[in-house]
Amino acid sequence: MNGAGTIQRLLASGLTIFDLTHIFYSHFHPDHTSEFVPFIFATKYPDGSRRKTPLTVGGGRGFLDFYEKLKGAYGSWIELAPELLNTIEFNNKKRDYRQFEDFSVETAPVAHNEESIAYRITSSDGYSAVYTGDTDHSETIIDLAQKTDVLICECALPDKLRVPGHLTPSLAGDLAARAEVRKLVLTHFYPECENADIEAESRKAYSGPLVLARDLMQLEIGL
């Protein structure tokens, strides 16, 4: 996910775009992908050789077509040399798995739109984090997130304002409780969440460690 403001926040954290080696998209809505074009453009110009490690970017089926259509609009401005960019697609109809050098990625389809997938990333020493992306309540997330160290879960709206395709605090709490996760991190708050007790609503179902995400927050996994 890299929606609006991601690059600025990355720089504020002390990192640069060249410190990132992998980007995985849950789906292609603009609030999740709007800085993909600036990211690729900033990688290429003024000198693409500044990137010393190839960038891998992926998403559910349809990502390659999504990228091709962006190139149809921006042309070579967002094309990187083949040795600098790897693009991959994950199956968005069933579970998928990829092994990388020092971590693995497992995905599962979720209930938001056609290409939507959730991710479970597991380090070589066995610690894991699950990111739901945008989703409605889904048994596939419960399966994917079983006993994960951290579940980073969307929580768009308070319970009383639930809409299809998104989670509320109590629904997110239910997923976390049933998956027996070690820590729940709620994120993707719409402005309506500012006037609700998100933690209390989540506690209707989940009693474990709970964090409300904020910009520039850093999470240590496995400690």
Region locations from a protein language model:
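Cap/insert and terminal regions of metallo-dependent hydrolase folds
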Residues: 136-223
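Acidic/polar short surface loop at catalytic or gating sites that assists cofactor/ion binding
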Residues: 45-90
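Core dinuclear metal-dependent hydrolase active-site scaffold
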Residues: 1-16, 86-143, 215-223
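P-loop/Walker A phosphate-binding loop and immediately adjacent motor/lid segment at beta-alpha junctions
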Residues: 39-56, 111-117, 122-123, 164-185, ...
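Hydrophobic packing residues within well-ordered alpha-helices of enzyme cores
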Residues: 10, 36-39, 67-70, 141, ...
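Structured loop/turn residues at beta-strand edges in well-structured enzyme cores
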Residues: 15-18, 53, 83, 101-103, ...
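Active-site neighborhood of phospho(di)ester-bond hydrolases with catalytic His/Asp-centered motifs
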Residues: 1-3, 21-27, 31, 60, ...
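Active-site metal-binding motif and surrounding structural segment of the metallo-beta-lactamase
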Residues: 4-56
